[in-house]
């Protein structure tokens, strides 16, 4: 006995597209998340702005004032007559001269007494002492002060300090050369004052830095030598 079966076709057309694979969907989500994380990481490692660098400073206020007093005299020297001309047309040179002299003095004092001590741990001053055996004769003595060698010196503070310390007198020398070419001898006198003040600070802080390093080196050698001798003479040392 034989039986024949006829396949019954459904009225609803079959979906030719296969069902979505959950593994593929999860894989795409992981890929997108990885790309997003990589973009975020790349964005966070971008170039730092001046604000970001100032935030890393140990003394941001002192660093800002140092940069201001170092750069303000140069800016006022170039554009000072323009701004003064907007206020008054009389005695522009005298006002320009007085403002620059005040900025030179403020920069010299701030660098010598505040910025050097806070940013790089260095300070200097000059003393006048009477010479022994000679009445009425005096000698100038340079006194250098350095911070504790264990004190942390911020690299950003140190880099900005030394760059502006040496860059400013170079800029004033360029301006002095231009004044000679233009026969501006009154401004040349002003620039000579700026060069003398800036070079004095540059030379003094350079000597102070070398003195501090040499003193720390000698102290380190002496402490090691005395420690070695004491350990050898100590009978209880292992």
Curated annotation (Swiss-Prot):
Membrane topology summary: Multi-pass membrane protein
Superkingdom field: Eukaryota
GO cellular component terms, semicolon-separated: Golgi membrane
Biological-process GO terms, alphabetical: protein secretion; vesicle-mediated transport
Transmembrane feature ranges: 67-87, 91-111, 153-173, 175-195
S-adenosyl-L-methionine in keyword set: no
Main subcellular location of this protein, as a coarse class: Golgi
Compositional bias annotation for Low complexity: 30-46
Protein purpose: Golgi membrane protein involved in vesicular trafficking.
Family designation: Belongs to the TVP23 family.
Protein name: Golgi apparatus membrane protein TVP23
Organism: Scheffersomyces stipitis (strain ATCC 58785 / CBS 6054 / NBRC 10063 / NRRL Y-11545)
Protein encoded by which gene: TVP23
């Amino acid at each position: 006995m034989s039986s024949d079966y006829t396949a019954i076709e459904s009225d609803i057309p079959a979906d030719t597209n296969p069902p979505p694979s959950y593994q593929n969907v999860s894989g795409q989500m992981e890929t997108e998340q990885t790309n997003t994380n990589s973009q975020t990481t790349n964005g966070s490692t971008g170039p730092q702005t001046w604000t970001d660098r100032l935030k890393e400073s140990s003394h941001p206020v002192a660093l800002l004032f140092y940069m201001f007093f170092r750069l303000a005299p140069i800016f006022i020297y170039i554009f000072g007559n323009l701004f003064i001309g907007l206020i008054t047309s009389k005695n522009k040179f005298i006002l320009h001269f007085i403002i620059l002299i005040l900025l030179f003095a403020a920069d010299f004092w701030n660098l010598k007494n505040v910025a050097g001590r806070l940013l790089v741990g260095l300070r200097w001053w000059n003393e006048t002492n009477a010479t022994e055996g000679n009445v009425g004769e005096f000698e100038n003595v340079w006194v250098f002060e350095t911070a504790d060698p264990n004190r942390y010196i911020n690299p950003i503070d140190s880099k900005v300090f030394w760059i502006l310390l040496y860059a400013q007198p170079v800029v004033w020398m360029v301006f002095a050369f231009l004044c000679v070419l233009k026969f501006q001898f009154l401004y040349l006198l002003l620039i000579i004052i700026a060069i003398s003040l800036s070079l004095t600070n540059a030379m003094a802080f350079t000597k102070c830095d070398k003195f501090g390093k040499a003193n720390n080196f000698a102290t380190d050698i002496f402490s090691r030598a005395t420690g070695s001798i004491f350990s050898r003479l100590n009978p209880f040392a292992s």
